[in-house]
Amino acid sequence: MVKFLVLVIFTLLAQARLGGASDQRFPFVRFQGCYDGDTCTTTDSEKVRLACIDAPELTKRPRLRATRMRPIAYDNSLFERSADHLRALVSGRMVGIRRITTDRHGRTVAELFIDDKNVGQQQVMSGHAVISRKYAWQCAWALGS
């Protein structure tokens, strides 16, 4: 039992140390805009996708009703709120970036930090995104959730 408690305490301390990463350790970028709640473009035209989260997507096509075959109204308000929240967080600020990998679309997958706070984690905590279980292993903060 004592070994188990020591292991749990060690794990929690390690996560706390990784979770509160200081933006002083990472290079800084500035963003010119955000496409949605998890993808932005830097002033150097680098497309960055926030690691470990999934935000609402833009609905481009109306779904058809099976009975009448007419387009039904679709709602992009969740998409817009998520994108607006991310824009409010990163616009006009120098943002620390920890590049992780490149995705199949050529975007940089990265964690972003503002004032020692993880931007992806802020999107999740505010309800504008969810943790992507498939990619949660890339971020220490997402593993504990």
Predicted regions and their residues:
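Small beta-barrel nucleic-acid-binding modules, primarily SNase/OB-fold domains
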Residues: 2-145
